[in-house]
Amino acid sequence: MHYIDWVILLTFAAALIVCLTPKPEPCIITVSGASATVSNCPNPELLTDLVKALKPAKPV
């Protein structure tokens, strides 16, 4: 096979792998008052702590 044939074959193989791998669901972060809830994440406890740390203590 020629070099260009290998390039095309590898491009199609990479595209097929990307299409067949499952896409992760987006995290849902809900902030209400002083509470924050995180759902659809692999580690929701860590993200909840992060959201609480980034949230200002007093409303501006």
Swiss-Prot record:
GO cellular component: host cell endoplasmic reticulum membrane; membrane
Lumenal-side positions: 1-6
Transmembrane segments annotated in the record for this chain: 7-23
Any Gene Ontology biological process: transport of virus in host, cell to cell
Subcellular location: Host endoplasmic reticulum membrane
Keywords noted in UniProt: Host endoplasmic reticulum, Host membrane, Membrane, Transmembrane, Transmembrane helix, Transport, Viral movement protein
InterPro entries (UniProt xref): TGBp3
UniProt KW Transmembrane helix keyword: yes
Primary location recorded for the protein, binned into one broad class: host cell
Family as reported in the entry's similarity comment: Belongs to the Tymovirales TGBp3 protein family.
Additional note from the record: TGBp1, TGBp2 and TGBp3 seem to act together for cell-to-cell propagation. TGBp1 is the main movement protein that physically cross the plasmodesma with the viral genome. TGBp2 and TGBp3 would facilitate TGBp1 function.
Function: Plays a role in viral cell-to-cell propagation, by facilitating genome transport to neighboring plant cells through plasmosdesmata. May induce the formation of granular vesicles derived from the Endoplasmic reticulum, which align on actin filaments.
Protein's recorded name: Movement protein TGBp3
Naturally occurring in which organism (per UniProt): Indian citrus ringspot virus (isolate Kinnow mandarin/India/K1/1996) (ICRSV)
